[in-house]
């Protein structure tokens, strides 16, 4: 009887910890294929509007040069914010966290993130992975 109680308590404790860890989970918001020529209209649309406090960017399959990024919020007047992104990301490299939506009292959900940039040093199109943290 005691072992059944110990196992039950252990399972409940494990479930409680996993739900706490899930609350601050980092989610892949999407992946963008970066063309070889400079392009300024690469959009990552977020199908389910979600509050995102910060993002990280990772380069896969090639190096990426970025010339800008903006985040768009779902509001009555389509508010947007320019992001301070690094000018280049090497293959396999992940940036530090880039803060967005910093006004905690006025939480706005993100509807899309746009990028300007292109692939460098690769015959294939590099992929830009966008990771979000709520």
Curated annotation (Swiss-Prot):
**InterPro entries the record matches:** UPF0412_YaaI (IPR020240)
Give disulfide pairs as residue numbers.
Answer: none
Task: Extract the signal peptide range.
Answer: 1-23
Coiled-coil blocks: none
**UniProt keyword Signal, yes or no:** yes
User: Which UniProt keywords are present, listed alphabetically?
Assistant: Signal
Q: Which family does it belong to?
A: Belongs to the UPF0412 family.
Can you say what this protein is called?
UPF0412 protein YaaI
Species in which this protein is naturally found: Salmonella paratyphi A (strain AKU_12601)
Give the gene symbol: yaaI
